[in-house]
């Protein structure tokens, strides 16, 4: 799904009960020819900060996913202090099946956030 993929082997992610916890991706240098850098599902306490993302031209982009970061059914997500070098692809964060309050993106972030319909409002409990 991405350079870093966090995909638990569970049948249906539940945003109220994430499978993984406390994952920090900090102070790395990514050199990618394609869009997705991080894809995370069902994580409570995900930090992506202080990373440098640089555009590579070694290959043509091939992945159908166009977001640089996708978070799905996660809680307590922080994205801050990242920088781009060159014409980096995937300058968006796609937020899926989450409430807005679960994602904190630092002011001045180079990322644009795209909320899906589920993220705009919390799921109703039955």
Where are each of the predicted segments found?
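Extracellular parallel beta-helix/beta-solenoid repeat domains
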Residues: 1-126
């Amino acid at each position: 799904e991405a350079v870093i993929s966090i995909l638990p082997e569970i049948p249906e992610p539940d945003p109220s009960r994430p499978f993984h916890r406390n994952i920090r991706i900090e102070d790395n240098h990514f050199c990618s020819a394609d869009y997705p850098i991080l894809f995370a599902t069902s994580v409570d306490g995900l930090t992506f900060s202080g990373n440098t993302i640089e555009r590579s031209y070694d290959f043509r982009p091939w992945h159908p996913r166009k977001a640089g970061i996708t978070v799905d059914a996660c809680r307590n997500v922080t994205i801050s202090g990242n920088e781009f070098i060159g014409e980096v692809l995937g300058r968006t964060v796609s937020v899926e099946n989450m409430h807005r309050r679960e994602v904190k993106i630092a002011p001045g972030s180079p990322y644009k956030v795209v909320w899906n319909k589920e993220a705009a409002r919390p799921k109703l409990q039955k």
